Design a protein with these regions (language model features):
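N-terminal pre-P-loop "Q-motif" helix
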Residues: 47-65
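Conserved catalytic segments around the Walker B and adjacent sensor/switch elements
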Residues: 90-108
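Conserved NTP-binding/hydrolysis module of P-loop NTPases
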Residues: 108-128, 135
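Conserved P-loop NTPase "ATPase switch" module shared by AAA+ and STAND
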Residues: 133-158
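Amphipathic alpha-helical "lid/sensor" segments that cap RecA-like P-loop NTPase cores
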Residues: 198, 206-250, 261, 299
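Winged-helix-like regulatory helical subdomains adjacent to P-loop NTPase cores
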Residues: 237-282, 286-287
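C-terminal leucine-rich, beta-strand-based interaction scaffolds used for sensing/assembly
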Residues: 275-319
Length: 319
């Protein structure tokens, strides 16, 4: 030790009793131990911060993956689908599950998605060979496919064929993540992600405002996580914030044609939930519900628009 002065050293000698005890422990105790209860994640799993208000939802997802070979996490854009997926992944890994994550885009086919999962060998190009390889090599794993709503129509049929074949071969289980509507996944068990409860949504706003003010903002933005994170104190009403207005108009409502937007605005003006049959155009209710734009009462008798959409559209209509 340089400049550390003299250092006293103690030497300890094993007794005969200690030697016997040491020998009885065996050689394995000399090797570093790796916890057998921890799984591994492969692929480009997104990084997330602290997750609020999703514990019950994650428990429901854990139950679904035990009961079904596949299911889908779905909901509005920005509602926290990927966040829930990553939080679920962390729980699965902690329980000893190996999983592989792949994020889709408009050009992805099944082979491209698998190539992003760090599989140990070059993938076979033949349909049957690839299915059998994945089913055998990854039998006890879970594959997570994010943004499946981006898959193009020309790749969807082959994607579903692979998934079906691997299920028949008792291969890895699948978790799909995507925004509604997801017509091609109608056959898959669904877990819809709702807005956050206001008591949890306020946690996204930090502690810089009074509790009552934070609750007001979270309520006006419908407990929508991304909208709350986009909020900046520049407008009298949270829903009039320019970033939030642009997000709802350009992203959330981007899948609706002009006629559907017109019918949506009839619901915007309603002061309270109504029965679906009493809507201005009851046929449009199904379209909006497929896109996760509606909130239903507990008995599913009445519906209204998601609060984020309702308040933002009302604000833009009064300009």
């Amino acid at each position: 030790v340089i400049g550390g002065g003299s250092r006293r050293r103690n030497v300890y000698h094993l007794t005969e009793e200690g030697r016997i005890l040491f020998d009885s422990l065996g050689e394995d105790t000399l090797k570093p131990r790796k916890s057998s209860s921890t799984g591994t994640a492969y692929g480009d799993v997104p990084q997330i911060g602290e997750v609020f208000g999703r514990s019950t939802l994650i428990q429901s997802a854990l139950s679904l993956i035990k009961e079904h070979h596949s299911f889908i996490l779905s909901g509005l854009p920005g509602i926290g689908k990927t966040t829930v997926g990553v939080a679920l992944s962390n729980d699965l890994i902690a329980a000893g599950t190996t999983l592989r994550w792949s994020t889709a885009d408009e050009f992805s086919d099944f082979e491209a998605l698998c190539s992003r999962m760090d599989l140990p060998q070059t993938l076979p190009s033949d349909f049957e060979a690839l299915s059998e390889y994945i089913a055998k090599q990854c039998q006890d794993e879970i594959f997570i496919f994010d943004d499946v709503h981006l898959l193009s129509q020309r790749h969807l049929s082959r994607f579903h064929a692979f998934c079906k074949q691997i299920e028949q071969l008792q291969g890895p289980k699948f978790i799909f993540i995507g925004r509604e509507p997801l017509v091609s996944f109608e056959h898959v068990e669904r877990l819809s992600i709702p807005p956050l409860e206001i008591s949890q949504a306020v946690k996204l706003l930090g502690e810089f405002q009074r509790k009552e003010e934070r609750e007001h903002i979270a309520e006006r933005l419908g407990g929508h996580p991304l909208a709350i994170q986009l909020y900046q104190k520049e407008a009298t009403l949270p829903e009039a914030n320019s970033d939030i207005q642009s997000y709802v108009e350009d992203v959330v409502l981007s899948t609706l044609d002009d006629s559907t937007r017109t019918e949506l605005d009839h619901l915007v003006l309603l002061p309270q939930p109504i029965e679906a049959s009493k809507a201005h155009d009851d046929e449009i209710v199904g379209t909006l519900d497929d896109s996760a734009f509606l909130r239903w009462t507990s008995g599913m008798e009445k519906m209204e628009l998601q609060h984020l959409i309702r308040y933002v559209r009302r604000s833009s209509m009064t300009k």
